[in-house]
Regions:
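Extended C-terminal subregions enriched in glycine
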Residues: 260-267, 271-294, 303, 334-341
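Acidic, glycine-rich active-site loops and adjacent beta-strand->loop/helix elements
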Residues: 14-16, 60-63, 91-95, 119-124, ...
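Conserved active-site "lid/cap" helical segment
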Residues: 1-94, 102, 160-167, 189-197, ...
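Beta-strand segments within the central parallel beta-sheet cores of soluble alpha/beta enzyme folds
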Residues: 50-60, 85-91, 115-120, 170-176, ...
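Active-site-proximal alpha-helical scaffold in enzymes
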Residues: 90-121, 150-184, 224-230, 337-360
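Conserved catalytic cysteine-centered active-site region
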Residues: 62-118, 122-141, 145-152, 190-214, ...
Length: 397
């Protein structure tokens, strides 16, 4: 089955990201406020109204702080809409891209012709208690000193360095390119340009992971609106079509007992998405890659087939800026714009839409026609990212 060109993004909305609430006495906003704000911006961008969403699709990314199963229903109440179809982006940071595929298929089925996909979080304003949930983390990781994602990614990063000779200089080129693009993006939270030496000198978090390797937690809300090709006519902005989509969860490369932690599900999901879209690597104008860590961006470039595994020369000679041969993270990514929990993945979708509309301003990729976007979620026990989604977006169907 193909969903190529069966749905398009017609509106985008993102609130500014902030860290209000991290200090006593600071003004705070709730997740509900960020949700309503992001929806209003997306509706305005599309030229639609609230009533256009009633009886239509609503997709909600599930923040890690809200384990309750009825969060999407609560979001519908918060927004004041009555969906005809409700989907949960429950794959962590992959949720925003997963919803692109799910809503495209649903729109193609004829059940709906418009969908709002939205997420928000306010980790610095809202604090939730709770113990460690049963599962691999409690049983197999924490007892041995692995405390959260920084520790896990440190092992992946160290393994790549050991196996392929990867250095901080190779990784730093990605960090510098992302920050350069952030310096051109008024919506970015971190905008001061950095050098590779700045990256190398940033403090250790979990050896060899450094501070400038890590995503920036933040408050904020993000949304996009999708529609059928017929419904896109006479709307405010040109439609950006979903040309291809692929997803893999619980991927395993090699024996289950010794899976290769340096390969992610984007290796398969990317191939499926690109084949559906009918594109090759040279056709893609830019990449918006899920960036909870710099090494994760590095791995995706390899796994998507832009270079061979361990090809250090590719990273030494490739310019990843908007002026180079393979622009990545053209808005700065989550590392520089901030990650409001799982809604952070929507940042990449929104930036891709801006680029394909030609709205990138100083950071516009010249002649951008096709972009590739990824979403990743869950760092499971025994292998790399557990949920991987890839979408190919284009200015034509």
């Amino acid at each position: 089955m193909s969903i190529r060109g069966k749905a398009a993004i017609v509106g985008i909305g993102e609130t500014p990201t902030d860290r209000l609430g991290s200090k006593p006495g600071e003004p705070r906003k709730s997740s509900a406020q960020y949700l309503a704000w992001a929806m209003r911006l997306a509706l305005e961008d599309a030229g639609l109204t609230l009533k256009d969403l009633n009886g239509q699709g609503l997709g909600v990314t599930i923040p890690t702080a809200y384990p309750q199963p009825f969060w999407p229903e609560e979001v519908a109440e918060i927004l004041g809409i009555t969906p005809g179809l409700l989907l949960a982006g429950s794959t962590g940071g992959a949720g925003a891209v997963s919803l692109l595929g799910q809503m495209s298929a649903t729109i193609n089925s004829g059940l709906i012709d418009v969908a709002l996909c939205i997420g928000a979080a306010a980790p610095f304003s809202e604090h939730f208690g709770g113990g460690i949930q049963p599962g691999d983390m409690r049983d197999f990781e924490i007892p041995f000193g692995t405390m959260g994602p920084n520790s896990k990614i440190a092992m992946v990063m160290r393994r790549h360095m050991h196996q392929y000779g990867t250095t901080l200089d190779h990784l730093g080129r990605i960090a510098v390119a992302g920050r350069y693009h952030a310096s051109l993006n008024p919506s970015a939270y971190l905008r001061k340009p950095i050098t590779i030496q700045d990256y190398k000198d940033s403090r250790l978090v979990a050896d060899p992971v450094r501070l400038l390797d890590c995503v920036l937690p933040a408050n904020g809300g993000k949304a996009y609106i999708m529609a059928s090709p017929e419904r896109t006519r006479n709307l405010r902005k040109p439609p950006i079509f979903v040309r291809g989509f692929g997803e893999r969860s619980n991927p395993s490369y090699g024996p289950r007992a010794a899976s290769d932690a340096l390969i992610m599900g984007v290796a398969d999901a990317g191939r499926v998405a690109m084949e559906m879209a009918g594109v090759k690597h040279g056709d893609i104008s830019f990449l918006e890659l899920y960036d909870d860590y710099i090494i994760v961006v590095y791995l995706q470039i390899e796994d998507l087939g832009f270079c061979a595994k361990g090809d250090l020369g590719f990273f030494e000679r490739t310019d990843f800026t908007i002026n180079g041969g393979l622009p990545i993270q053209t808005g700065g990514g989550m590392i520089n714009c901030g990650q409001p929990s799982t809604a952070g993945g929507t940042i990449h979708v929104i930036e891709a839409v801006r680029q394909l509309r030609g709205e990138g301003d100083q950071r516009q990729v010249a002649g951008a026609k096709i972009g590739l976007v990824t979403g990743l979620g869950v760092l499971p026990y025994g292998k790399n990212l557990g949920c991987c989604a890839v979408a190919v977006l284009a200015s034509d169907a």
